[in-house]
Amino acid sequence: MDEDGLELQQEPNSFFDATGADGTHMDGDQIVVEVQETVFVSDVVDSDITVHNFVPDDPDSVVIQDVIEDVVIEDVQCPDIMEEADVSETVIIPEQVLDSDVTEEVSLAHCTVPDDVLASDITSASMSMPEHVLTGDSIHVSDVGHVGHVGHVEHVVHDSVVEAEIVTDPLTTDVVSEEVLVADCASEAVIDANGIPVDQQDDDKGNCEDYLMISLDDAGKIEHDGSSGMTMDTESEIDPCKVDGTCPEVIKVYIFKADPGEDDLGGTVDIVESEPENDHGVELLDQNSSIRVPREKMVYMTVNDSQPEDEDLNVAEIADEVYMEVIVGEEDAAAAAAAAAVHEQQMDDNEIKTFMPIAWAAAYGNNSDGIENRNGTASALLHIDESAGLGRLAKQKPKKRRRPDSRQYQTAIIIGPDGHPLTVYPCMICGKKFKSRGFLKRHMKNHPEHLAKKKYRCTDCDYTTNKKISLHNHLESHKLTSKAEKAIECDECGKHFSHAGALFTHKMVHKEKGANKMHKCKFCEYETAEQGLLNRHLLAVHSKNFPHICVECGKGFRHPSELKKHMRIHTGEKPYQCQYCEYRSADSSNLKTHVKTKHSKEMPFKCDICLLTFSDTKEVQQHALIHQESKTHQCLHCDHKSSNSSDLKRHIISVHTKDYPHKCDMCDKGFHRPSELKKHVAAHKGKKMHQCRHCDFKIADPFVLSRHILSVHTKDLPFRCKRCRKGFRQQSELKKHMKTHSGRKVYQCEYCEYSTTDASGFKRHVISIHTKDYPHRCEYCKKGFRRPSEKNQHIMRHHKEVGLP
């Protein structure tokens, strides 16, 4: 090698002694090394002084793993050593030197540095180390191997413990771990795991039971005989426990491998929870003593087997990857012994949960891109984040666990095979981990005792449910039954019900029985077959304050004529008398009904104009002369006759005039004359405009709006023809339809095949269909309208399946 060197960063307070001093000896294949404090190896700096005469006696005598090639030791600032001078056999090395970074195949032959040499850089072209090496207080020799021999290394550590492994084969041997270094654990720890030798027999197992315990400050001894597992001797000259009864922080590393056969439900793993009571069955703080138990946290990482760079991993190879579980915590002597006893009991007890393998192949695919280290294995850096200081655990009280929410899922982070963190969802009952919420929900079906527990319970009865909305709906049924006076009563039969649903079912019975019953409004001529529609009509039309009040009964009326007619009930006045009998009535409509029902057979002859009946034909003819004399003004466009010219003019303008020049600015309604528009505008003043919630129709009169909704936007047709069963929304429409069955005059359209007995309907047909002056036409039937609102109403009534454009 041309130049090999190390950078020394701190003042030297430890040394290598190659003179065979006491405490360091070579016993066959066994090397005994005393280690006290941790040192680190750093980078190379420029050179000023070179130390020569370092010739290796036997290149294969000592091998230090994980070395760095082409490193030069330079710039040794030693006032007592001259350049190119021979030195003795003793070398003083500063604190932060780690032999894992010493140049490969370099040994120390003869090198002595005086005691007063401070932090320096020593360079050498060739160095050798004898078999007996003594280390000072601040040097850790991590991994020393003898090539070609099966050896055993025993490290006696006073202040910290570092695991060491003996390499039984040359460097080309498949190695899982060569060096584990834990540094600066006050806030976080970084573990560089390069692998641990794995026997071929252990590869066939589903998981590994080997584990490593790394103590950062505790004294201990790790022994390895090359054939059996590693052991750790915790005997030390220094008491590891502190004065306050606490012990240094402990990191426990559990290594296990994945099983290719466990791929259902996305792969599961049973890992002990991070709380101390779940890990060891010991409370956080013993109330009978001041001993503090370990404060532990769970971290997961993986260590991949050595794989060629050009070889892709398949499902079976991913399943064989090694996973690590790391527990970090503080420990004292008594608690450590108790934890060790519990751990041994768990290892012997078959019912205790063990580490189950994870089949990451089925869950995350064949992603084999990982970080490669110098030996070719995937190197995973483990970051441990501590939430609390090391000295504040005794002052903290154990936190109470929050009640888990069924809609929230706990997660755990596992470093996957590719070195990236993976989120898993643990089962709160058995501890298994799953890659998604869906697999966790499917797994929860295996716990029927958990599913049987309902989250929400009714306080009034034994009803339970898992859904909040179901409980809310159930509580609604108790609102009306809590008090007897709040029971719902049927307005037709007086029967009481506990909730609205039962009342609605009961009303359906009344609806079927009284399908033909008509409900008439007390204030107007409105009639309907459903009581609900009548109630809505009363609220929409007659809910205002009526100014004309009866002084006898307090009933209100909208017009004085209605009040005058009502007062005849209290006074007994009956001004209308039947001309055929002594019947008298307070209402003219009742008199007409009486004549039709009682005297229709006695007077079979009826006037076609006013529908009056007579006993013989002479009376009818005399009566017809009255109509002819009174209506001498004949309309030129139709058969309409008027008694005076003004009525005839009004008829022609309203029926036979197509233009509406006078339009309202508020509702866009058109009128023939300005006087009509003036009356219409006066109706808008001081009145609130009511907007139809189904279309753009607006009106100040709520009664008209209600009639509009019932006629245009209501599907119910309560009035049906007894002959053809055709339905109508209003009784007036039914009366017009009945004329088609009476053999009356039929109006035939000259432009199409349309015919009707209703003269007004025939005129509307001619104007809307066969007139070109209507700008708004229906897109489906080409019918014309004067205003857009009329077209929208037509579409809603006759083209419901299409809807508004």
Swiss-Prot record:
Keyword Transcription in annotation: yes
Phosphoserine sites (modified residues): 274
One Gene Ontology cellular component annotation held by this UniProt entry: chromosome
GO molecular function, one term: chromatin insulator sequence binding
GO biological process, one term: regulation of transcription by RNA polymerase II
Keywords recorded for this protein, A-Z: Activator, Disease variant, DNA-binding, Intellectual disability, Metal-binding, Nucleus, Phosphoprotein, Repeat, Transcription, Transcription regulation, Zinc, Zinc-finger
SUPFAM superfamilies, A to Z: beta-beta-alpha zinc fingers (SSF57667)
C2H2-type zinc finger locations on the chain: 425-447, 456-478, 488-510, 519-542, 548-570, 576-599, 605-627, 633-656, 662-684, 690-713, 719-741, 747-770, 776-798
Superkingdom: Eukaryota
Localization, UniProt: Nucleus
Pfam family, one: Zfx_Zfy_act
Signal peptide: none
Family matches, as PANTHER family: C2H2-TYPE DOMAIN-CONTAINING PROTEIN-RELATED (PTHR24384:SF189), FINGER PUTATIVE TRANSCRIPTION FACTOR FAMILY-RELATED (PTHR24384)
Function per UniProt: Probable transcriptional activator.
UniProt disease annotation: Intellectual developmental disorder, X-linked, syndromic 37: A syndromic neurodevelopmental disorder characterized by developmental delay, intellectual disability, behavioral abnormalities, hypotonia, congenital anomalies, and facial dysmorphism.
Family: Belongs to the krueppel C2H2-type zinc-finger protein family. ZFX/ZFY subfamily.
Protein name per Swiss-Prot or TrEMBL: Zinc finger X-chromosomal protein
Classification of source organism: Eukaryota, Metazoa, Chordata, Craniata, Vertebrata
Gene this protein is translated from: ZFX
